């Protein structure tokens, strides 16, 4: 990992973004980039999709969410911000790009203000991302969002 950076999705890089694939054994844990881009379009007020480049090479995709409620019908549900999607390209994992992306999302949440925690959800299963998120300091909250585990990272711990 030389000098990773985040870039907006543009007309010039959208085809490369859509072509980005995770390892085949991870496809059941994360939606493809094309679905994320469709969700970002539909939820343009709360979604923050970015591409992860190292030099000129596209190595991943990350999408954050800002100020959403998981259970809007629950009056005690608070707005949350966090990591919606993380796709690191097959062959580029284990090089620090995922950590970089999580740190970048954390910094963006901190910059926007109003949050004490970063939220993430993940699908459970062998080979899934739980260990990665726990290593970064996320802790299970005991909640589920659909069929996914909810984890949180206190911003004061970062």
Residue spans for each PLM region:
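Conserved beta-strand-loop-alpha-helix junction that forms the acyl-donor binding cleft
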Residues: 118-130, 146-148
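Short acidic/polar active-site loop segments enriched in Thr and Asp
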Residues: 115-116, 139
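Active-site acidic-Proline motif in GNAT/NAT acetyltransferases
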Residues: 89-91, 95, 124-125
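Conserved acetyl-CoA-binding loop of GNAT-fold acetyltransferases
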Residues: 133-143
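Acetyl-CoA-dependent GNAT
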Residues: 3-4, 8-91, 104, 108-112, ...
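Short C-terminal beta-strand
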Residues: 152-154
